[in-house]
Structure formats: structure tokens, C-alpha cells
Amino acid sequence: MDFWLYKQAQQNGHHIAITDGQESYTYQNLYCEASLLAKRLKAYQQSRVGLYIDNSIQSIILIHACWLANIEIAMINTRLTPNEMTNQMRSIDVQLIFCTLPLELRGFQIVSLDDIEFAGTDITTNGLLDNTMGIQYDTSNETVVPKDSPSNILNTSFNLDDIASIMFTSGTTGPQKAVPQTFRNHYASAIGCKESLGFDRDTNWLSVLPIYHISGLSVLLRAVIEGFTVRIVDKFNAEQILTMIKNERITHISLVPQTLNWLMQQGLHEPYDLQKILLGGAKLSASMIETALQYNLPIYNSFGMTETCSQFLTATPEMLHARPDTVGMPSANVDVKIKNPNKKGHGELMIKGANVMNGYLYPTDLTGTFENGYFNTGDIAEIDHEGYVMIYDRRKDLIISGGENIYPYQIETVAKQFPGIIDAVCVGHPDDTWGQVPKLYFVSESNISKAQLIAYLSQHLAKYKVPKHFEKVDTLPYTSTGKLQRNKLYRG
């Protein structure tokens, strides 16, 4: 198959591929820049590299250049500690890291994009492409890679089953795992998203989620497959994002629930040109859904994983109005089922589809990942008679107290409705009698007593579900995409 960027450069070359508000690159420009850089990257003779990058045009060029040079990219979360980065990269045998941000990491060859010399004018485009932006390329270092060197030859096609990217699970429930994502996985995910969410060549997608996460990278893949424009943003600022929505004809945006909340607080009280607000990464509260729908905001709740190359369940505004707790229905190209449902229909969510990874790169000895072709997500879910899917909790988060299954989300939902509580999370606390009992961590600026909380929660929850321990904290641990890191709260 032809590289998607190469195909867009041929068929959709003058369309804007990427803009940061200051610079804009057409698909022709993007392909030319990526091709020139790819020749430089091939000189490093690496089949797999780490990427330590920001949300920028240069980072996007680097990603495509790696693919054109047949290099697998391992995405590095820039919020990790040096030790965490080292452990991740060593686990998958990465020796070299390309970066668009300053990085010092012992034991690796670190190469800044600014230090990579560009090839010049000997790239062949067969007359298909032209430099419509008038970009000037520096040809003074032409001898760095000989023109006829094998490393100077770029492929314009690829194998769908080759690994495109490697990401590590967010580590919200334990040790991180290396997830290989093939071009086929990404393509199937994009097609499923188009069917369930909807986008076309006229889409203008504002992307502020980190590229090093699947939620950010998947937008770039959808764009290059379909040929639409991405408005890339490096950092989330509610005031600035709202201004972009108002003034830049933004049709699509990917957010986590908290960032949507900040935007509504900032004044996002009408859709403007927005056609789709794609939400994911954390649970969406009923109150937020109600507020967003009152503003006629086109919110689409979703559920996906690193292992599934982003979303595979999507809930439309109509679905959310009918059932606020749903994450919707599966994309047409995937199959989902519930394993071993209990009397309430709750069981482990299983998925099968071309978007699902084939198995972890690290650790390689994990068992129970797949069963009869279905990937075990590890989530407790339900599929109702209309086909709506509800996600309740990670199986690892389930609290088993005296033989009773307790879903933390149910307790958290009730606790967050208590006046003065800003945020709350419930985890299992070791107990000599019951094995585990619920413990509630909460954030509040008010003085709330344990007795007050017990009295309130007892009105809404069965006695065995009422937390036995409470702890007020300043903040709760979240990842950069808004996922709660419960494992950091598991302590005696």
C-alpha cells in the first residue's frame, strides 16, 4: 500500500495538512519536508527509535519521516522520570532517541531535530509535487549522505502489518506494557472512527492531546488517511482554545472531560462551527453531560485503549440523552462481548477487530491477553438489550469485600454529589475481617467530617458499600490525558 502521506500529496496536495496558527503546510509541503528528513534519518541505520516530542509541526514531520524511512517509533511520555524513560526504552531495545524538546538521558544516543542536516534538492518527486509554500532548503551539506547511497532511497509504499508505533500503557493499574501498533491497526481504527463519529476532507480538527498518546497520534493518522486539516496545539489553555473555536472554523476537537469542563467554565456555551466534540480518557459525569447538552454541544463519549489504537465504542448525543452512563456502541468493524456475565449482566469486556494489537512486545510472557481471538480489556462492562455498552470499572479496581463485588465508580459518583467535594476516588483498603473495605480519597476546600460523609453515603449506598476509611488530599494523581492513576493510591 502507498504511504498515506504520499497518496495525499499526489491527490490532495494543495490542501492544508497541518497548521499551528502561525505556519501552515499543505500535503505536498509536508511530504517534501518529511522525505528530505527521512533521507537523513536513514543514515542513522536504526529500525526502531524513541521519540521525545512536543505537539508541533516539526514533530509531525519527524513522525512521517520515520515512517518513510521504515523506522518504528516508540513514543515517550515527556512527563516521565528519567528512570521510567530508561526502563521503557531498554525493554524494547531502543538505542537512539530523536527529540524536538531538550532531553538528557544517559545510556542512549540523543539526537535533536535541530541537529539533523537536511538533504537538499536530490529528492525525487517524479514531477508530482511542487513547493507551493516557497520553502528554501539548505543544500550546503549535500555530501553528508551520498546521493546514490542505499540509505538515500525512500520507499513510497509499506506493509500494513509492519509496526508503525509503539506505546506504553498509561500504567493506571500497575506495571506498564509495550503495545505494538501496526499500520493495519491504525487504519482500522481510523475507518471505525469515521463510521461512528464522522469526518471528511473538510474537517478541521483541533488536536491538543499529546501526540505521544494514542488519543493524539490517532488524530494525525485519521487526517493523513482522509486528507483533512489538523490544527495542532502544544498546551491546553481554555481561553486560547475557546478563541480558536470561535475564530478558526474548528469542526472537531478531542478532549478529556476535565478540559471540556474548563472550556464550558470559560464560556463554551454554544457549538459555533463545532460538529463533533470527542471525549475519552476518563469517565463522563451525568452532570457534565446534562450541562453540555443544554448548551447544544455535540459531545460524543467514547472508550478505547492503547491496545485498540484509540476508540472502538462511541456514544452520540442522542445516546447520551437516553442513557448518560453509556460509552455507546461498537464501531461496525469490531465485535465486542461480555465474558462470564453475572446476574446483572456485568462481566469482562472482550473485543475483536483489525484495530487490536497482536500481543505485547514487553512483557512477552503475559497470559490471558487473548481468548478465542478476543482481546481481554480487563474492564467490567454491560451490554444492554439495545446494544449500549456501559463500562463500570477496571477488573483490577474492583473491590471484593466479604465476597461482595463493589464498583468504586458507584461510590465515587455519589461522593462527588456531596456539597463541597471537588473530586473523589475510592480504592480497596486491606482489612483483616473482610479482605478489603472501601476507602475514599477526596478533594475539598471545606471542612467535611467523616460522620457527615458516612451519613450522606448511607442514604444512597448499601451498608457494605459505604467506605470505612476517608482521607482528604490536596490533589488526586492523573496522567497527562486525564486518567486517574489508582495504583498510586493503593497503600495500607
Curated annotation (Swiss-Prot):
Superkingdom of the organism of origin: Bacteria
One GO-annotated biological process of the protein: menaquinone biosynthetic process
InterPro entries: AMP-bd_C, AMP-bd_C_sf, AMP-dep_synth/lig_dom, ANL_N_sf, ATP-dep_AMP-bd_enzyme, MenE
Residue pairs linked by disulfide bridges in the UniProt entry: none
Reactions performed catalytically: 2-succinylbenzoate + ATP + CoA = 2-succinylbenzoyl-CoA + AMP + diphosphate
Transmembrane intervals: none
EC code(s) of this entry: 6.2.1.26
UniProt pathway: Quinol/quinone metabolism; 1,4-dihydroxy-2-naphthoate biosynthesis; 1,4-dihydroxy-2-naphthoate from chorismate: step 5/7; Quinol/quinone metabolism; menaquinone biosynthesis
GO molecular function terms attached to this record: ATP binding; o-succinylbenzoate-CoA ligase activity
Keywords tagged on the record: ATP-binding, Ligase, Menaquinone biosynthesis, Nucleotide-binding
Function, in words: Converts 2-succinylbenzoate (OSB) to 2-succinylbenzoyl-CoA (OSB-CoA).
Family in the record: Belongs to the ATP-dependent AMP-binding enzyme family. MenE subfamily.
Listed name of the protein: 2-succinylbenzoate--CoA ligase
Native species: Staphylococcus aureus (strain MRSA252)
Gene expressing this chain: menE
